[in-house]
From Swiss-Prot:
Its EC number is 1.17.7.3. Its cofactor is [4Fe-4S] cluster. The gene is ispG. PANTHER family: 4-HYDROXY-3-METHYLBUT-2-EN-1-YL DIPHOSPHATE SYNTHASE (PTHR30454), 4-HYDROXY-3-METHYLBUT-2-EN-1-YL DIPHOSPHATE SYNTHASE (FERREDOXIN), CHLOROPLASTIC (PTHR30454:SF0). This is 4-hydroxy-3-methylbut-2-en-1-yl diphosphate synthase (flavodoxin). [4Fe-4S] cluster binds at residues 281, 284, 316, 323. It catalyses: (2E)-4-hydroxy-3-methylbut-2-enyl diphosphate + oxidized [flavodoxin] + H2O + 2 H(+) = 2-C-methyl-D-erythritol 2,4-cyclic diphosphate + reduced [flavodoxin]. NCBIfam families: ispG_gcpE (TIGR00612), PRK00366.1 (NF001540). It comes from the Bacteria. Keywords: 4Fe-4S, Iron, Iron-sulfur, Isoprene biosynthesis, Metal-binding, Oxidoreductase. It comes from Pseudarthrobacter chlorophenolicus (strain ATCC 700700 / DSM 12829 / CIP 107037 / JCM 12360 / KCTC 9906 / NCIMB 13794 / A6) (Arthrobacter chlorophenolicus).
Length: 388
């Protein structure tokens, strides 16, 4: 039996700073905080009342690598749908509650793993913390105190004039103190803003105030490209300093795209084991092959492979051979041909028309050998692919 030694680490190496020490809470079966892996969340876009559509979207999110899912609960009809959704979902469900405190209790009774509360817009929220804490404790439900720049309490807005980092943190710490006064500690906190600079400052400030697990998010981040940049910038700044215990990338895009981006951010910081990664040059005047098309074809051909494999697609002889040698599998193209490398060794030279086919064949061979060595199928699921 042949085993394949790959260049990428099996376990994530240390990040730039040690992980911040926090208490641990449970969101269903998923630990958040302390030494629990950083989880990736998303939120459904279907009407919660459409139970089948919501469960279908949750299944798609689960398949893409989502750890925790949030569903909206703006009405009594939505609240009535929660028990079935919570019971049938493959991953923990969080109910997202605004305005009406009665839906907090409904979500807890429905069996949701957690409830997100927005203290800035739930009527008389502070007066009901004692009852919410008691209900959550009785049902083993955790809470997210979700402070948002767009819905801060009027008193705090008046004090600070706008949603500053200090305003976000003051709101969060106040609500945390109320829960703790009633002996409830199973909560995490978020202080979201649509400006990554303000968001980062708020989380850094909040991290100094207590040992609460922190849910990272840039609110209203925007369309896919803009939102990805904002989230990657903010999350990278915080996670590299050890701040953050669960993340949600907010995009004006299908929820599955949020999971792809979130997983890629964690993998890029070595906070989650890498899977399939495509390394390709940006192309330039030296390129002797259509790198864009080649990279897209290789990416499409390897879709569905869940192996820690780095594949290099290079377009010329300047950096091509070196990059290809550093990868587990790669090609350096030029003069109508492609040199195929496996672990730094040239195994063959093929015509340009056969590059994609050859790379896919070699990747499949490596995957099969890994599957035999591990006693499991390594060619399944959906990879997180980056073409740079």
């Amino acid at each position: 039996m042949t085993s394949v030694s790959l260049g990428m680490p099996a376990a994530p190496p240390p990040v730039l700073a040690p992980r911040r020490k926090t208490r641990q809470i449970k969101v269903g079966s998923v630990g958040v905080g302390s030494d629990s892996p950083i989880s990736v969340q998303s939120m459904t876009t279907t009407p919660t009342t459409d139970i089948n559509a919501t469960l279908q979207q949750i299944a798609e999110l689960t398949a893409s690598g989502c750890d925790i899912v949030r569903v909206a609960c703006p009405s009594a009809d939505d609240a009535e749908a929660l028990p079935i959704i919570a019971r049938k979902s493959q991953i923990p469900v969080i109910a997202d509650i605004h305005f009406q405190p009665k839906y907090v209790f409904a979500a807890i009774e429905a069996g949701c793993a957690a409830v997100r509360v927005n203290p800035g817009n739930i009527r008389k929220f502070d007066d009901q913390v004692k009852e919410i804490a008691a209900a959550a404790r009785d049902h083993g439900t955790s809470i997210r105190i979700g402070v948002n720049a767009g819905s801060l309490e009027p008193g705090i807005l008046k004090k600070y004039g706008k949603a500053t980092p200090e305003a976000l943190v003051e709101s969060a710490v106040w609500e945390a103190s109320l829960f703790e006064e009633h002996g409830f500690h199973d909560f995490k906190i978020s202080v979201k803003h649509n400006d990554p600079v303000i968001m980062v400052a708020a989380y850094e400030m909040l991290a100094e105030k207590g040992d609460w697990p922190l849910h990272l998010g840039v609110t209203e981040a925007g369309p896919a490209f803009q939102g990805t940049i904002k989230s990657a910038t903010a999350f990278g700044a915080l996670l590299s300093r050890g701040i953050g215990d669960t993340i949600r990338v907010s995009l004006s895009a299908p929820p599955v795209e949020e999971i792809k981006v979130g997983n890629q951010i964690l993998q890029s910081l070595n906070l989650r084991p890498r899977k399939l990664e495509i390394v390709s040059c940006p192309s330039c005047g030296r390129a002797q092959v259509d790198v864009y098309t080649l990279a897209e074809q290789v990416t499409a051909g390897l879709e569905g492979m869940e192996i820690p494999l780095r594949v290099a697609v290079m377009g010329c002889v300047v950096n091509g051979p070196g990059e290809a040698r550093e990868a587990d599998l790669g090609v350096a193209s030029g003069n109508g041909k492609g040199q195929i490398f496996v672990k730094g060794e040239v195994i063959k030279t093929v015509p340009e028309s056969q590059i994609v086919e050859t790379l896919i064949e070699e990747a499949m061979r490596i995957a099969e050998e890994m599957g035999e060595a591990d006693g499991e199928d390594a060619v399944k699921g959906g990879p997180v692919v980056s073409v740079s």
